[in-house]
From Swiss-Prot:
Keyword Manganese: yes
Protein's name according to its UniProt entry: Carbamoyl phosphate synthase large chain
Gene that this sequence comes from: carB
Residues holding Mn(2+) 3: Q827, E839
Ranges for domain MGS-like: 951-1096
Lineage: Bacteria, Bacillati, Actinomycetota, Actinomycetes, Micrococcales
Region (Carbamoyl phosphate synthetic domain): 547-950
Length: 1109
């Protein structure tokens, strides 16, 4: 059936900020969907609060709303835009829950809007655990024995039937939030309590434990003519009990017998029909008992999910794109496969390779958190690799994680350690794979480890095989052709072979290349080479036949940013994608190298060619060699993907690879303290007093000279890893003792910490002659909080025009002194009217997408062209990529105000005792994503940013205030304002006295440390947990009060109420609350903002010309 003709406009709901469990994969699916809708001639309206996404680029939709994704706001957009339909299946759980709410509230009916891509009945059947159980039974399949409960008493009753351990899963949550394993009644009370709170319907499922069973999922699609395809089967390396997002996963499933696979297929097809998904994709998860072969259906997601992004990248079958076409009325047999251009989408993909996905964790950011893996997802990113066999794909995937110790270690294992390793491996943690492999290497048997871990014996055999190959390498003596070929076919890196043969990586590489042992590149074509592929999408293998086609002109390589992690996320992928788009438009062939399956950059049609490879020196050099042999390389961009490719810049240049844009020497100069301070001296600029130390004696001497507090950090890090503010000598000695690897090459940097300074962030472009200043951001939190976690506002709201002018001059002097060609990000601090330079990064920064969205200028595209020799003047005139006059520092007074707010993952991480980790901000970055609020005025923009970050401010109720002595004076005005607005103020001891003396009625409550009174009056933490407080404002002080504050903040985080920890943010919140009480919110699209901005810039230019004349 051809597509429907009655739909003229569609509203797509995005997934909002990147959080654990809902990450970049939804930008990838959303971008594909928007492209399809536009190609089909529809008017496209988008709402998404995350500015770091490609899908919110104005060219992808006709009206792009960067607004909070709440039913109230989406209703405003529907009222204004009047779409014919809403497509909610591409924005994860956020979009689905919003669509369900709009349907329940009667909004869809009121405006006569249809839901496409999924119907409410199918969502309810798939997501509501009680109803889904019925579906499975009607299909003649089994689900685990279970009870649905809504209260704690019901839970305790159900426990009598099910017995411990049991699995607890709330309904309608994402990434396993609020779920867990209860081994006893205490666990049950704790987990069910959280689950009832996180589930929007206060419904929780308790089910029998199927711990240790094998877990699989099938990715399916169905159209309205009842054609069903199974796109991909995925198997989890870890047994049931570890969330699939935290497990190593393998596609296709490798340990199923043919009969078992057919059974899973039959059940899946019956389930998708019974649920009624008929215009899109879904995934279904199964567990199989290894002892009896009993099959149980775990759950299904009636939408595009994390697994569908993985399945798309693993097979080349564009699930999101095809799901969108199905929602418009097409059927699978009418949709062509992009890669082969001959087969329709009703052909199931066939794989002649193995795909392995490995999660990337960030426990180093939360030292107090427990690294046991459970049914609540904790990983922040993932890497994927492909190989001709499992061992090769696994080793490549581990190498792609880029974490110290992420590659398998084959050094010998003493006998006494084996028993300890087996014992440790019983508990699933981030280290389990390594413990299992080391135990096998030390002589443990496959049986022993299967007993301990329930990991399928086939996988354990594969690890044993890797250990065998490592022994052969060690015993070979010399680097022979046979040995190297065997090692390479099992995925060993030159570095690993070097360690086993006592050679350097460079020597191994030299010998290997001299012997002619080089990888070839195979193609992902969805059909195991049955038809030719038109979209070159490659992976390396040590095989016979190379499939890279000849190209007529030299290519430009863009090195991506690898797996997402805290400090290096989707913002860097955004710059890589923009560079590829701009360079292709300018007529270049672009080649993307990356290993992150979630992102837009690894979509097969973003660049001319895609290599799905680890970003290590060895792998990148081989890709460059493959490009050289087939048509030449013009150069490589290393400054778009964050720290990952930057680290390779010097080694690539040493290997004779041309680096485009800023040179490796300039990159080094900005990182090198001494050289950089000479640039500042020459320009007459100052930085906070600082020094570098390689020992505690050095550090003590420097700290005494510059005075405490000091900021200490290792050199060459991103996201403030290992950074700390140190207030005295004992803490300094503790920091140095814990700092790993302080060497003369990697000293510790010590800076004077500027208290009460305003931090300023600048993104600019420089071409060697001219500068274009993209934007000046003023941080809302004071200095000392990592720039990635601080809220910031553009244009700046409290900086005078003379400060802006000084920032401009300083930015230009630094860009020129460093020798930047392209993007540079500089952080300044303004203290007592002195402008200090904190640091300069000659690369794309994490604020580039935000600045681009706020000012309507796509800076990463401009930077890519500057790297190929285009000047800023040409970008203003010929390319029309930059405004003809002025820049981001000369925005007119009526320009919209944009606020960027960080989104933090504290509710996911718990200490071993089950408490939430502390939500205090500091110099080490902890946020996973960001949102943007944009409006005519700062107060409303700030309110929108808080709502978008799931931290909506209250407009009435009780506010708890307790601040450190140093802050008491500065909060009186704000608290008085809240009191005047009718809020009830609640406070402890000292703060309450100060407030009362200033005429503010404050109700006193007990501190956490005081405990409950004899009369049973609870503490402030008890009030928060009981839901009696609407907002917490608590600034930390030292010692006991610190733990008091922690208990309080943990209570606020676990119940999900706003918890403010800095004075500056509190004052902004008071302004925002007042604005919310006074004005109605309006919604404005980026396209409307850009048009208005253009008008006022023209008017300003005309006025300036008149004055000249």
């Amino acid at each position: 059936m051809p597509k429907r003709t009655d739909l003229k406009s569609v509203l797509v709901i995005g997934s909002g900020p990147i959080v654990i469990g809902q990450a970049a994969e939804f930008d990838y699916s959303g971008t594909q969907a928007l492209r399809v809708l536009k190609e089909e001639g529809l008017r496209v309206i988008l709402v998404n609060s995350n500015p770091a996404t490609i899908m919110t680029d104005p060219e992808f939709a006709d009206a792009t709303y960067i607004e909070p994704i709440t039913p109230e706001v989406v209703e405003k957009i529907i009222a204004k835009e009047r779409p014919d339909a809403v497509l909610p299946t591409l924005g994860g759980q956020t979009a689905l829950n919003t669509a369900i709410a709009l349907d329940k509230n009667g909004v869809l009916e009121k405006y006569n809007v249809e839901l496409i891509g999924a119907n409410i009945a199918a969502i309810e059947l798939g997501e509501d655990r009680e109803k889904f159980k019925g579906v499975v039974e009607r299909c003649g399949a089994e689900s685990a024995r279970s009870h649905i409960i809504h209260t704690m008493d019901e839970a305790l009753e159900a426990a009598k039937d099910l017995g411990y351990p049991m699995v607890v899963r709330p309904s309608f949550t994402m990434g396993g939030l609020g779920s867990g394993l209860a081994y006893n009644e205490d666990d049950l009370r704790r987990i069910v309590g959280q689950g009832l709170q996180y589930s929007p319907t206060s419904e929780v499922l308790l089910e029998e434990s199927i711990l240790g069973w094998k877990e699989y999922e099938l990715e399916m699609m169905r159209d309205k003519n009842d054609n069903v395809v199974v796109v991909c089967s995925i198997e989890n390396f870890d047994p049931v009990g570890v969330h699939t997002g935290d497990s190593i996963t393998v596609a296709p499933a490798l340990t199923l017998t043919d009969r078992e696979y057919q059974k899973l297929r039959d059940v899946s097809i019956a389930v998708i029909r019974e649920v009624g998904v008929d215009t899109g994709g879904c995934n279904i998860q199964f567990a199989i008992d290894p002892a009896t072969g009993r099959v149980v259906v775990i759950e299904m997601n009636p939408r595009v999910s994390r697994s569908s992004a993985l399945a798309s990248k693993a097979t080349g079958f564009a699930i999101a794109k095809i799901a969108t076409k199905l929602s418009l009325g097409y059927t699978l047999d009418e949709i062509p496969n992009d890669i082969t251009q001959k087969t329709p989408a009703s052909f199931e993909p066939t794989l002649d390779y193995v795909v392995v996905k490995v999660p990337r964790f960030a426990f180093e950011k939360f030292p107090a958190a427990d690294n046991t893996l459970t049914t609540t997802m904790k990983s922040v990113g993932e890497a994927m690799a492909m190989g001709r066999n499992f061992t090769e794909a696994l080793q490549k995937a581990l190498r792609s994680l880029e974490q110290k110790g992420s590659q398998l270690d084959f050094s010998s294992v003493p006998e006494y350690e084996v028993a300890e390793l087996i014992e440790k491996a019983k508990r699933p943690t981030t280290d389990r794979l390594y413990q299992v492999q080391r135990a096998l290497l030390g002589g443990a048997t496959v049986e022993q480890l299967f007993e301990a871990t329930k990991i399928d014996p086939w996988f354990l055999d594969q690890l044993e095989l890797l250990n065998e190959v490592s022994r052969e390498i060690r015993q070979a003596g010399a680097l022979t052709t046979d040995m190297l070929q065997r090692a390479k076919r099992h995925g060993f890196s030159d570095e690993q072979i070097g360690a086993l043969t006592h050679n350097s990586e460079a020597v191994v590489r030299g010998v290997r290349q001299a012997l002619g042992i080089r990888p070839v590149y195979k193609t992902v074509d969805t059909c195991a080479a049955e038809f030719a592929a038109y979209t070159p999408y490659h992976y390396s293998a040590y095989d016979e036949e190379d499939e890279v086609a000849l190209h007529s002109k030299p290519s430009i390589l863009i090195l991506g940013s690898g797996p997402n992690r805290i400090g290096q996320g989707i913002e860097f992928d955004y710059s890589c994608v923009h560079a590829s788009m701009a360079l292709r438009k300018a007529g270049y062939e672009t080649v993307m190298v990356n290993c992150n399956p979630e992102t837009v950059s690894t979509d097969y049609d973003v660049s001319t060619r895609l290599y799905f490879e680890p970003l290590t020196l060895e792998d990148v050099l081989e890709v460059i060699a493959a490009e050289e042999r087939t048509g030449g390389v013009m150069g490589v961009f290393v400054q778009l993907g964050g720290q990952t490719p930057l680290k390779l810049a010097q080694q690539l240049a040493d290997a004779g690879v041309p680096i485009l844009g800023t040179s490796p020497e300039a990159i080094d100069l900005a990182e090198h303290r001494g050289a950089f301070s000479r640039v500042l001296d020459k320009a007459g600029l100052v930085s906070p007093k600082n020094g570098t130390a390689v020992s505690f004696e050095d550090a003590k001497k420097i700290a005494d000279e510059i005075g405490y507090p000091v900021l200490v950090r290792p050199s060459y890090v991103l996201g403030g890893r290992g950074m700390e503010i140190v207030y005295d000598e004992p803490n300094l000695s503790r920091y140095i003792a814990n700092a790993t690897e302080i060497t003369p090459d990697h000293p510790v940097l010590i800076d004077r910490f500027l208290e009460d300074a305003v931090e300023i962030d600048v993104d600019a472009l420089f071409d060697g002659t001219d500068m274009y200043l993209g934007g000046i951001m003023e941080h809302i939190e004071e200095a000392g909080i990592h720039s990635g976690d601080s809220a910031c506002v553009l244009p700046p709201i409290t900086l005078g025009s003379n400060v802006v002018e000084r920032v401009r001059t300083a930015t230009r002097a630094i860009a020129e002194g460093v020798g930047v060609r392209g993007l540079i990000n500089i952080q300044f601090a303004l203290a007592s009217d002195v402008l200090y330079v904190l640091e300069a990064n000659p690369r794309a920064s994490r604020t580039v997408p935000f600045v681009s969205k706020a000012t309507g200028v796509q800076m990463a595209k401009a930077a890519a062209l500057i790297g190929t020799g285009v000047t800023i003047n040409q970008l203003r005139t010929a390319y029309k990529m930059l405004p003809e006059t002025g820049d981001g520092s000369t925005l007119p007074l009526d320009a919209p105000v944009a606020v960027k707010e960080a989104v933090l993952p504290f509710s996911r991480f718990r200490t071993p005792e089950g408490k939430v980790v502390d939500s205090l901000l500091g110099p080490e970055m902890r946020s996973t994503g960001e949102v943007m609020g944009i409006d005519k005025h700062f107060d409303t923009a700030f309110a929108k940013s808080q709502a978008g970050a799931n931290n909506a401010l209250p407009t009435e109720g009780k506010v708890f205030v307790s601040v450190a002595n140093r802050d008491k004076r500065s909060v009186i005005m704000g608290v008085k304002r809240l009191s005047d607005l009718g809020f009830e103020i609640v406070s402890t001891g000292g703060t309450a006295d100060v407030l009362r003396r200033n005429g503010i009625a404050a109700t006193p409550v007990r501190k956490v440390a005081e405990g409950s009174s004899a009369e049973g009056e609870g503490t402030i933490a008890d009030l928060v947990v009981a839901g009696e407080i609407d907002m917490v404002f608590n600034t930390p002080s030292g010692g006991e009060a610190r733990s008091d504050g922690y208990e309080l903040r943990a209570a606020a985080t676990s119940i999900g109420i706003p918890c403010i920890t800095t004075v500056a943010e509190f004052n902004a919140a008071v302004q925002a609350i007042e604005a919310m009480r006074t004005y109605e919110w309006s919604v404005t699209s980026l396209q409307e903002h850009a048009a208005a901005l253009g008008e006022s810039q023209k008017a300003a230019a005309a006025k300036a010309d008149l004055q000249h004349a």
